Amino acid sequence: MALYCVGDIQGCDDAFERLLATIGFSPSRDALYVLGDLVNRGPDSAAVLRRCITLGDSVRPLLGNHDLHLLAAAYGTRRPSRRDTLQGILLAPDRDEMLEWLRHQPLARRVHHGGGDLLMVHAGVLPQWTAEETLAYAGEVEAVLQSREFAGFLQQMYGNSPDLWSPELQGTDRLRVIVNALTRMRFCSPEGRMDFESTESASEAPPGLVPWFDAPGRRTLNTLIAFGHWSTLGWLDRADVLGLDTGCVWGGCLSAVRFGTTLADRERYHVECPQAQMPGA
């Protein structure tokens, strides 16, 4: 079995199809982990979801901020913005099947491969969290999303406060911090206070902030973390982190990594993407 991770697809189904062909993906033999943001901004989000559903258990996605936004828009708790390209899902005859499938995906995954652990999230992991805590906290949100109370949670999910984790947090505040860390965070303070304003590259960190993966004392330092979300960061391949959002929807490329016999043995694949959105438009 070959193990792959792929970055943000964001509704670019043609690029997704070409990438699957490039890697020679076999649903009966391989596993493909999609690091969130399957939908939105690209031309055919519905086709991406249908393709993933058709490929069955061989495709194992995470929820990203755009996927949560789709759920909120679909269930009436968030108005679509003018830049959204979600109508193909919202008006589709199989919309309920796609939304239910998406709602039951996790916010974090971990896989043991070649003697090591790979932790996968869409955006980031707070420096205070261990890998085990990350999975447990993600599970708290997943339990609510997959319950009958999910619509109420989606209505209360949005907001930038609190921006600092405490294990004493409860209720909506606790779940919001977890969601924001896993699906929105790029920069944080050295003590883990999240910033939601800057979308610049890691080398242009605002004063007093660092990329989340460079926070001092990060407790997941010895676990390889694969993530997406940060298109201005681009491809990042370090011993401890692997960033795979290479800006497909912005005219960059859609990237995947194939792991060999160990997590350190990895190879990048990518396909070029036509520009579907103009930054700042």
Swiss-Prot record:
Enzyme's top EC category:
hydrolase
Q: What top-level branch of life does the organism fall under?
A: Bacteria
Return the protein name: Bis(5'-nucleosyl)-tetraphosphatase, symmetrical
Q: What's one Pfam family here?
A: Metallophos
An annotated Gene Ontology molecular function: bis(5'-nucleosyl)-tetraphosphatase (symmetrical) activity
Going by the UniProt record, its keywords in alphabetical order are:
Hydrolase
Described by its record, this protein's role is as follows: Hydrolyzes diadenosine 5',5'''-P1,P4-tetraphosphate to yield ADP.
Alphabetical list of InterPro entries matching this protein: ApaH, Calcineurin-like_PHP_ApaH, Metallo-depent_PP-like
**Catalytic activity annotated for this protein?**
P(1),P(4)-bis(5'-adenosyl) tetraphosphate + H2O = 2 ADP + 2 H(+)
Renumbered to this chain, the signal peptide range is none
Q: Which family does it belong to?
A: Belongs to the Ap4A hydrolase family.
Q: What Enzyme Commission number(s) does the record list for this chain? A: 3.6.1.41
From which lineage does this chain's organism come?
A: Bacteria, Pseudomonadati, Pseudomonadota, Betaproteobacteria, Burkholderiales
